[in-house]
Each structure stands twice: as structure tokens, then as C-alpha cells.
Swiss-Prot record:
The lineage of its organism: Bacteria, Bacillati, Bacillota, Bacilli, Bacillales. It comes from the Bacteria. The gene is recX. It comes from Staphylococcus carnosus (strain TM300). One of its GO terms (cellular component) is cytoplasm. Modulates RecA activity. InterPro entries: RecX_HTH_1st, RecX_HTH_3rd, Regulatory_RecX, WH-like_DNA-bd_sf. Belongs to the RecX family. Keywords: Cytoplasm. It is found in: Cytoplasm. GO terms for biological process: regulation of DNA repair. The keyword Acetylation does not apply. Pfam families: RecX_HTH1 (PF21982), RecX_HTH3 (PF21981). This is Regulatory protein RecX.
């Protein structure tokens, strides 16, 4: 059976040691492994002893990777598992690492959800649904997802949504109905519910500048008319033009007035 003939501190890492058996380098181990097995010069190690040491050292290596990964920011159990799998840590060692991290508080899903909630409310314009999706993607338990999504909805100031809606409103062009639809769609994509969107939009002024709308309608009319005059003529051309402008959100009477003004359709 092999005997421990030397244990020396590694030159580049004072917390790791080189283990020599029968004058030959066997493996590197960390301080915890050294202490855990009470290794010292002269120890005789069986095959079973070596297997235990190797397994424990593999666990310690995985734990080192996990703690280093967790040092940059909060992580979920799923994220840590995936990180360790990329480094080819065995499933049994991963299970031990995760158990240790949960027990010692390195992984805390409630703390993760709370921190993400506060950060997103404070620094982003995203609504509760985007927050929910992020928690699900990170592997947070369903009960916590529902609990913290509800907290997100309660704590996000309606004023922030109103400011965002007003900002979006000023970015949208076109008739009133079209602008309303565009703002609602943008807010839905950012993760807000219909209820919150409707409440936030109650006091917004969607009435566009009349001169701006007149100019936009004139441009749309010319564009649509040129498109359809290649295929249609007469009454059919007029109806196709009106239908296209109605789909864009313009009022029927406004369209007819602009067409007459432009010399298109009925006089």
C-alpha cells in the first residue's frame, strides 16, 4: 500500500498542497481536505482511502467554483448547477455542493427574488410579467414566483407607469386610436397588465396636434393611393384607399374630406 512521503505547499497557491505517495506526485489537495483526513507524512493509504480523498477533493473543487461564481452576484440553485456542469463536476459532488450552499446561505431564493424585485423596480421600466419570466427562467419555485410577482405589482408606483406611458405617447405618431393602441401594445410588451395600463393611461392627453395629423394623413393618402392606382381605378380605387386609411386609425369623415381636398373621389 502506498505511503505518504511528502506534503508540500504549492508555490502559486499557499492554500493548496501537493500530495506525494512513495516519492511520486499523486494529486493536489486543499487545506480543508488535508485537515478533514488528517493527512501527514508516513500515513499508509488504502485504495478505499484514496477513493475517499479524491471524491472529497472533487467536492471541494466544485465548492470553490460555486462560491467564486456566487461572489459576483446572487445566483439560484439552477444557475449554480449549470455552472458546475459546464466544469464537469460529478452529479454527486454537485448535490453536495448545492446542499452546502443552501445550508450556509450562499443560495437563498427568497433573497434572490427580493433583490431582483427591488433592482428592477428601481432601475428598469419593466412590469411584473417580465419579472415573473426572469424568476421562472432562473429556476425559482412556483410559490415564490407568484408571491414575489404579487409584491412587485404592489410596490411598483403607478406614477412610474404613467410617466412611461406619457413618454411612449410622445414617441408615437398618427391618429388618436392608433396612438392608443401602440402605447398599450408597448406597455404589454414591457410586462404590464391590461388593468394597470388602462389605469395609467386615464389622464393622458391623446389628442394629437391637428396640423400634424393633417400632414400625416396627406402623406398616408398619397402613399396608399399610389400603391392602389396600379391595380384599381374609379370607385374601387377610392374604396381600397379609404379601407387602408381606416385600418391605420383615421376617421372616415376625415379621410373623405382629405380625399376631396386632394381631388380624389367624389366632389
Amino acid at each position: 500500500m502506498p505511503k505518504v512521503t511528502k506534503i508540500e505547499v504549492q508555490k502559486k497557491n499557499k492554500e493548496r498542497f501537493n500530495l506525494y505517495l512513495d516519492e511520486s506526485f499523486e494529486m493536489g489537495i486543499d487545506m480543508d481536505t488535508l485537515v478533514h483526513f488528517n493527512l501527514k507524512k508516513g500515513d499508509v493509504l488504502t485504495a478505499a482511502n484514496m477513493e475517499d480523498i479524491q471524491k472529497y477533493e472533487h467536492f471541494r473543487f466544485g465548492l470553490h467554483l460555486a462560491i467564486q461564481y456566487l461572489s459576483y452576484r446572487k445566483r439560484t440553485e439552477q444557475e449554480v448547477v449549470q455552472h458546475l456542469q459546464k466544469h464537469e463536476i460529478s452529479e454527486s459532488a454537485i448535490a453536495e455542493v448545492i446542499d452546502y450552499c443552501n445550508r450556509e446561505g450562499y443560495i437563498d431564493h427568497e433573497d434572490y427574488a427580493e433583490s431582483l424585485k427591488n433592482t428592477m423596480i428601481r432601475t428598469t421600466d419593466k412590469g411584473p410579467e417580465i419579472f415573473r419570466q426572469k424568476l421562472i427562467k432562473a429556476g425559482i419555485e412556483k410559490s415564490l414566483v407568484e408571491n414575489y410577482t404579487a409584491k412587485y405589482e404592489e410596490e411598483q408606483p403607478l406614477e412610474d407607469v404613467e410617466i412611461l406611458a406619457d413618454k411612449l405617447l410622445h414617441q408615437k405618431k398618427g391618429p388618436k386610436k392608433k396612438r392608443i393602441d401602440k402605447v398599450k401594445q408597448s406597455l404589454l410588451q414591457k410586462g404590464y397588465s391590461f388593468e394597470v395600463i388602462n389605469e395609467a393611461m386615464q389622464n393622458l392627453d391623446f389628442e394629437p396636434d391637428s396640423e400634424e395629423i393633417d400632414l400625416l394623413l396627406q402623406r398616408e393618402l398619397e402613399k396608399v393611393f399610389r400603391k392602389y392606382e396600379r391595380k384599381y381605378e374609379g370607385r374601387q380605387l377610392e374604396m381600397k384607399t379609404i379601407e387602408a386609411l381606416l385600418r391605420k386609425g383615421y376617421e372616415y369623415d376625415t379621410i373623405k374630406d382629405k380625399m376631396r381636398e386632394s381631388g380624389i373621389g367624389d366632389e
